[in-house]
Regions:
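Conformational switch/transducer regions in large eukaryotic molecular machines and scaffolds
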Residues: 1-152
Length: 152
């Protein structure tokens, strides 16, 4: 939280670089849709959870085109996932990637059931994905952000 120009994004980018993490930001334009949002979420969750990449997701108040964007971010922060984001075939692909990544890193997976592999995916998301909300306390979204802030 801070006024525009106070360096929230610059400091986040610097810290991301120093920590050797990947920076992920969405690129919102006039045609950015809910489908684009869901695809971006899938991409970042797969990178963090299936590929085991350390990622900082920098999300600003100017990128909120729909209130459901905040709801999805809230779900990721509280549970590590967005319900019904992935179709069954996408989940199968994710679990294959989890197995592949674990083998490359020389980790023991133990039981390779769907539930166990999905738990590994969720654990990876929770430990590898860091979400930074760069918000301004002033402007049209301040009421929404105040309500959102108090929900935690």
């Amino acid at each position: 939280m801070g006024m525009g120009g106070s360096g929230r994004q610059s400091l986040t980018k610097l810290a991301t670089f120093i920590a050797n993490y990947e920076l992920f930001q969405i690129e919102v334009n006039k045609t950015y849709s809910m489908e684009n949002w869901k695809n971006d979420l899938k991409k970042v969750l797969k990178r963090a959870g299936a590929d085991g990449k350390k990622i900082v997701f920098l999300f600003t108040d100017l990128q909120i085109k729909d209130e459901s964007f905040l709801e999805d971010v809230s779900m990721i922060l509280t549970t590590g996932e967005v319900p019904n984001l992935f179709a069954a075939d996408e989940k199968a692909e994710i679990l294959d990637r989890v197995q592949h990544t674990a083998r490359e890193e020389g980790r023991e997976l133990g039981e390779t059931s769907f539930a166990n592999l999905y738990n590994i995916f969720m654990t990876n998301v929770k430990s590898n994905l860091h979400i930074v909300l760069a918000m301004s306390p002033v402007g049209t979204r301040s009421v929404t952000l105040t309500i959102y802030k108090h929900s935690f």
